[in-house]
Amino acid sequence: MLDEWFSETFPELSRARNLESVFDSWDMPSEDRRAIEIVKKYAEMYQDCPGIRAGLWLYAGDWETAHLICQSDESATGSWWHAILHRFEGDAFNSKYWYRRAVDHPVRDLITFDPQELVEYSQGKNEGRLYLQKEEFFTLLRWCVENRK
């Protein structure tokens, strides 16, 4: 399972911040000071991997830092993270724009849904959305780690 992969890959971070505390919300994950301090260490380890850094900052709840990273990363990976950030923010128009820029990303073949549809699905509060958010986040982050992106 993807959350087991996360716990094995980022053990200190997964102990600091329970997965459910990030994905049980309909909105942007709240900022977690302890997780932010841990992500600072990982950010140094992955300084050449903006996709990993953006995902970890999002996990820690630091939207601003994750957004700055995405804005400076013009790759499809940066665009995908950018789309996720704007979806969490409730900005459907921007989210769809960034998903269109990531249309050829390899992660599209690894998830079970169309991320553009998730933007529409995100407008309502339902458990299915939470599951898909979690699947998308961990699939993209795992791809970034495996490909050093």
Segments (PLM) and residue ranges:
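N-terminal alpha-helical interaction modules that lie
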Residues: M1-S72, R101, H105-K149
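Conserved, surface-exposed functional patches that form binding/active-site neighborhoods
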Residues: A92, K96-R100
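Alpha-helical protein-protein interaction scaffolds
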Residues: H82-H86, W98
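Amphipathic, hydrophobic secondary-structure cores in small proteins
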Residues: T77-G78
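Short coil/turn linking the two alpha-helices of tandem helical-hairpin repeats
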Residues: F88-G90
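Structural register within alpha-helical repeat arrays
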Residues: R53-A54, H82, N94
